[in-house]
Amino acid sequence: GGIPAGDVEKGKTIFKQRCAQCHTVDKGGPHKTGPNLHGIFGRATGQAAGFAYTDANKSKGITWTKDTLYEYLENPKKYIPGTKMVFAGLKNEKQRANLIAYLEQETK
């Protein structure tokens, strides 16, 4: 099964509620508790310049795509054991798809 079609506006709401306290998405945006996410699609884990990642994130060695984000966001600590991201994950497939649709648009 592929990823369901996502709704950007609904994804924006999820981002504001669940992600924005630790992450920014705009180009040149600051790192907060978590790294700025601009340009995340096609980038390897643990590679945003100037952010202090855990070794787990640096050594995971995958590239962020819709598919890897979809799996990661369901259960971050299972996907990258040792990550310091405290987010428990989004179990709802549609919510993950919406969030990814928003990220795809906003991090370019």
Swiss-Prot record:
Keywords, ordered alphabetically: Electron transport, Heme, Iron, Metal-binding, Mitochondrion, Respiratory chain, Transport
Cited InterPro entries: Cyt_c-like_dom (IPR009056), Cyt_c-like_dom_sf (IPR036909), Cyt_c_1A/1B (IPR002327)
Amino-acid positions noted as binding heme c in the UniProt annotation, renumbered to this chain: 19, 22-23, 85
Modification note: Binds 1 heme c group covalently per subunit.
A GO MF label: electron transfer activity
One Gene Ontology term, aspect cellular component: mitochondrial intermembrane space
Main location (coarse class): mitochondrion
Gene3D superfamilies: Cytochrome c-like domain
PROSITE patterns according to UniProt: CYTC
Protein location: Mitochondrion intermembrane space
Pfam families: Cytochrom_C
Protein family membership: Belongs to the cytochrome c family.
Function in brief: Electron carrier protein. The oxidized form of the cytochrome c heme group can accept an electron from the heme group of the cytochrome c1 subunit of cytochrome reductase. Cytochrome c then transfers this electron to the cytochrome oxidase complex, the final protein carrier in the mitochondrial electron-transport chain.
Name of the protein in question: Cytochrome c
Organism: Eisenia fetida (Red wiggler worm)
